[in-house]
Amino acid sequence: MANSGLQLLGYFLALGGWVGIIASTALPQWKQSSYAGDAIITAVGLYEGLWMSCASQSTGQVQCKLYDSLLALDGHIQSARALMVVAVLLGFVAMVLSVVGMKCTRVGDSNPIAKGRVAIAGGALFILAGLCTLTAVSWYATLVTQEFFNPSTPVNARYEFGPALFVGWASAGLAVLGGSFLCCTCPEPERPNSSPQPYRPGPSAAAREPVVKLPASAKGPLGV
């Protein structure tokens, strides 16, 4: 049967990864400006995410603005949005399936084989969610790196990796690792009972020999 301890470990790892995927999707710090300004008093930090761009001043004031148009966004931002939203949805479905399929829950106890397969399906969806997140974050980071090292990019327009990218990488790793643990707990199919049958001794040799009855005329005077 499936190892319930390994299932619980995989579930909580994948659940933490899914929460991190949600946080990475919502955070606006996918890339941050590496130029602080010439004057410390007027320094402004710029952040950009999938849904908004923010500016934080040295006084602590932060102003954020949502992107006005969906069609006006760059293709990599739209692709990253789609991948992250798909990852969040896959993680939600995987969470439900994993709860139903884990051995420690009471749902579907009458069919442990089907219950184990449901847990494996949940683990596979967690892995897909992690891969979607890993693709979106890595693709975005690659473009940020290319823009940073592009000689034609002005110094005040160069960006570096934001905290959301690191959260996304860590969350993707947790989701893939937890989903792998759930997939590794596949229950073995039940085998027919092959226990040896109890030994039953056959009839004795004396019992197997036929009994010959003599006719009455062949008996002696004493009846023998």
Curated annotation (Swiss-Prot):
Q: Where in the cell is it found?
A: Cell junction, Tight junction; Cell membrane
Q: Changing G20D does what? A: In HOMG5; ER retention of the mutant protein; more than 90% decrease of homomeric interactions; loss of interaction with CLDN16; loss of cation-selective paracellular permeability; when overexpressed in the retina of PN0 mice, leads to retinal degeneration characterized by altered morphology of bipolar cells, shortened bipolar axon and dendrite lengths and decreased light response; no effect on interaction with CLDN18
Q: Name the GO terms of the biological process aspect.
A: actin cytoskeleton organization; bicellular tight junction assembly; calcium-independent cell-cell adhesion via plasma membrane cell-adhesion molecules; cell adhesion; cell junction assembly; negative regulation of cell migration; negative regulation of cell population proliferation; negative regulation of gene expression
Q: Where are the transmembrane segments?
A: 8-28, 82-102, 118-138, 161-181
Which stretches face the Cytoplasmic side?
1-7, 103-117, 182-224
Variant or mutagenesis effect after changing R81W: In HOMG5; partial localization at the lateral membrane and partial intracellular; when overexpressed in the retina of PN0 mice, leads to retinal degeneration characterized by altered morphology of bipolar cells, shortened bipolar axon and dendrite lengths and decreased light response
Name the membrane topology term.
Multi-pass membrane protein
UniProt entry keywords in alphabetical sequence: Cell junction, Cell membrane, Disease variant, Disulfide bond, Magnesium, Membrane, Primary hypomagnesemia, Sensory transduction, Tight junction, Transmembrane, Transmembrane helix, Vision
Asked if the keyword GTP-binding belongs to this entry, the reply reads no
Catalytically driven reaction(s): Mg(2+)(in) = Mg(2+)(out); Ca(2+)(in) = Ca(2+)(out); Na(+)(in) = Na(+)(out); K(+)(in) = K(+)(out)
Write down the Pfam families for this protein, in alphabetical order: PMP22_Claudin (PF00822)
Disulphide linkage map: C54-C64
Example of a GO MF term: paracellular tight junction channel activity
Summarize the protein's role: Forms paracellular channels: coassembles with CLDN16 into tight junction strands with cation-selective channels through the strands, conveying epithelial permeability in a process known as paracellular tight junction permeability. Involved in the maintenance of ion gradients along the nephron. In the thick ascending limb (TAL) of Henle's loop, facilitates sodium paracellular permeability from the interstitial compartment to the lumen, contributing to the lumen-positive transepithelial potential that drives paracellular magnesium and calcium reabsorption.
> Tell me, how does this one assemble?
Can form homo- and heteropolymeric tight junction strands. Interacts with other claudins including CLDN3, CLDN10, CLDN16 and CLDN18 with highest affinity for CLDN16. Interacts (via PDZ-binding motif TRV) with TJP1 (via PDZ domain).
Tell me what this protein is called: Claudin-19
Q: State the organism's lineage.
A: Eukaryota, Metazoa, Chordata, Craniata, Vertebrata
The record's gene field reads: CLDN19
